[in-house]
């Protein structure tokens, strides 16, 4: 473990993330513009794709970071039997959920039960599929539905706020099962589906279209919210949530229904709306991507 990763264990995660939240919403013109210009320069942000391409038009850093895209800039795969990529970013890992375990990096894994905070819920994904998508600071930070789904429940799992950058993922054991996260359960035509919004260092919040700000949700207990009977349906490709800074979304899919798109591998750059998986009846190859051991 290198010095930087070791340091992340010692940092006051909550204090830093709280400070980041206040700064992100600051509307002082000098402060917000310095932050916006710094991020654009450091991470090579492409504002030509944004609905508002003028970097000076955003009232706060958070408004810039959660910016919308131009209409039609990310056309979704038109095949209704294709599950869509939920976000812009880069594949961290993807593949089968073997013996209830989700691969994180070479020599690192965690259980679906740890991730979801619920043994019964995790059992629905035994021998299913997962995909972990990392959103860097340069990416579009809204998460969209891979397919039409009915919201069943959410689970807020408190935890740490480690960085979720590539170095941290390789070196911090069970990272995604230790960080604070919001687990969103849906019923879909493909069966049960879970989207996990993972918090991280300096992430000032996670918002959903149905509940507003879900993280931070201070406390040390797992919190369940039941949405059955409230008829909250979100259409395929519609926005379902957004990060107020870069982080990670993990998709869990049931067994024997879908096969992951064969061109996807770890570290693949991905865009919102491209194919993530195909229904097995489409006669695609069922071979899962190879993972490092």
Swiss-Prot record:
Required cofactor(s): pyruvate
Localization: Cell membrane
Catalytic activity: a 1,2-diacyl-sn-glycero-3-phospho-L-serine + H(+) = a 1,2-diacyl-sn-glycero-3-phosphoethanolamine + CO2
Keyword presence, Secreted: no
Record key words, sorted: Cell membrane, Decarboxylase, Lipid biosynthesis, Lipid metabolism, Lyase, Membrane, Phospholipid biosynthesis, Phospholipid metabolism, Pyruvate, Zymogen
UniProt PTM: Is synthesized initially as an inactive proenzyme. Formation of the active enzyme involves a self-maturation process in which the active site pyruvoyl group is generated from an internal serine residue via an autocatalytic post-translational modification. Two non-identical subunits are generated from the proenzyme in this reaction, and the pyruvate is formed at the N-terminus of the alpha chain, which is derived from the carboxyl end of the proenzyme.
Record-level GO cellular component terms: plasma membrane
Active-site residue numbers: 88 (charge relay system), 144 (charge relay system), 247 (charge relay system), 247 (schiff-base intermediate with substrate)
GO molecular function: phosphatidylserine decarboxylase activity
Pfam families: PS_Dcarbxylase
Membrane topology label: Peripheral membrane protein
Cofactor remark: Binds 1 pyruvoyl group covalently per subunit.
Broad class of enzyme this protein falls into: lyase
List of residues that carry Pyruvic acid (Ser): 247
Lyase in keyword set: yes
EC nos: 4.1.1.65
HAMAP family to which the protein is assigned, alphabetical: PS_decarb_PSD_B_type1
Subunit organization: Heterodimer of a large membrane-associated beta subunit and a small pyruvoyl-containing alpha subunit.
Functional summary from the UniProt entry: Catalyzes the formation of phosphatidylethanolamine (PtdEtn) from phosphatidylserine (PtdSer).
The name this protein goes by in its record: Phosphatidylserine decarboxylase proenzyme
Protein source organism: Xylella fastidiosa (strain Temecula1 / ATCC 700964)
Name of the encoding gene: psd
